[in-house]
Amino acid sequence: MTMMDMNFKYCHKIMKKHSKSFSYAFDLLPEDQRKAVWAIYAVCRKIDDSIDVYGDIQFLNQIKEDIQSIEKYPYEYHHFQSDRRIMMALQHVAQHKNIAFQSFYNLIDTVYKDQHFTMFETDAELFGYCYGVAGTVGEVLTPILSDHETHQTYDVARRLGESLQLINILRDVGEDFENERIYFSKQRLKQYEVDIAEVYQNGVNNHYIDLWEYYAAIAEKDFRDVMDQIKVFSIEAQPIIELAARIYIEILDEVRQANYTLHERVFVEKRKKAKLFHEINSKYHRI
């Protein structure tokens, strides 16, 4: 195993640890594509964790400087400051793919702002956040998952990322509240007459369910729109993207089956993932 192989393996471990659903799906890509996904996922995870886990603004700055070095001089040797193994893997990807570096910087800017979290006044602000933390990831992955990236390809990948982030929010309402965060907008909370603190303490009510389903309908519509345009991605990537997205959309039904609880995190069981895999395998005849 070469040093570069070890770098990618390190990135893969990060992906498997933090996103079993993504790993389950994207590990089915051809080798070069899945390695690129591992590297990009690991970079994005380190960006997220720099503040959420480490509380280290200097580390986030180092990540940004390392990415800038790769963008400016992709073929030169660099003394990376953040995580050398991840950055070497990203540099290798950047030498072969047209990486949308600005999307990394947009993600970093969102993480900067997230240090001083305040509730969103409107849904527009919420959806802007979903773009910043997840739509950006879709943009960065676009050259990996498509043969000829176009404006439409970037748009579809961005919408998929935003949809998956909204699903994360719908899954983690209780956990986020425990961390003193409410992502639903004040505008919509007022409209549906919902107080998350009250729901957390006293239990789910019809007002909360209606609010939750309002946002779930948005995520489900975006999911359907992405599936309708799945052919913008490469033949190899289409079934993988559909598998990842369908596993994620299943999370919404898991929340419903758990009576919209705010006191436990739901997940999609392995047997359901396997069932989806076989369905999509039959549809595409190529996974």
Curated annotation (Swiss-Prot):
Enzymatic reactions: 2 (2E,6E)-farnesyl diphosphate = 15-cis-4,4'-diapophytoene + 2 diphosphate
Domain of life: Bacteria
Signal peptide span: none
GO BP term, example: carotenoid biosynthetic process
Main enzyme class: transferase
Binding annotation for (2E,6E)-farnesyl diphosphate 1: H18, S19, K20, S21, Y41, R45, R171, Y248
Pathway(s): Carotenoid biosynthesis; staphyloxanthin biosynthesis; staphyloxanthin from farnesyl diphosphate: step 1/5
The keyword Metal-binding is annotated on this UniProt entry: yes
Entry binding sites for Mg(2+) 2: N168, D172
SUPFAM superfamilies noted in UniProt: Terpenoid synthases (SSF48576)
Record text on cofactor binding: Binds 2 Mg(2+) ions per subunit. A third Mg(2+) ion binds between the 2 farnesyl diphosphate (FPP).
Presence of the UniProt keyword Cell wall biogenesis/degradation in the record: no
Cofactor dependency: Mg(2+)
Annotated binding of Mg(2+) 1, by residue: D48, D52
This protein's UniProt keywords: Carotenoid biosynthesis, Magnesium, Metal-binding, Transferase, Virulence
Residues annotated for (2E,6E)-farnesyl diphosphate 2 binding in this entry: R45, Q165
GO molecular function: geranylgeranyl diphosphate synthase activity; metal ion binding; squalene synthase [NAD(P)H] activity
E.C. designation(s): 2.5.1.96
Annotated InterPro entries: Isoprenoid_synthase_dom_sf, Squ/phyt_synthse, Squalene/phytoene_synthase_CS, Trans_IPPS_bact-type, Trans_IPPS_HH
Protein role: Involved in the biosynthesis of the yellow-orange carotenoid staphyloxanthin, which plays a role in the virulence via its protective function against oxidative stress. Catalyzes the head-to-head condensation of two molecules of farnesyl diphosphate (FPP) into the colorless C(30) carotenoid 4,4'-diapophytoene (dehydrosqualene).
Family, per entry: Belongs to the phytoene/squalene synthase family. CrtM subfamily.
Name of this chain's protein: 4,4'-diapophytoene synthase
Organism the protein comes from: Staphylococcus aureus
Record lineage: Bacteria, Bacillati, Bacillota, Bacilli, Bacillales
This protein's encoding gene: crtM
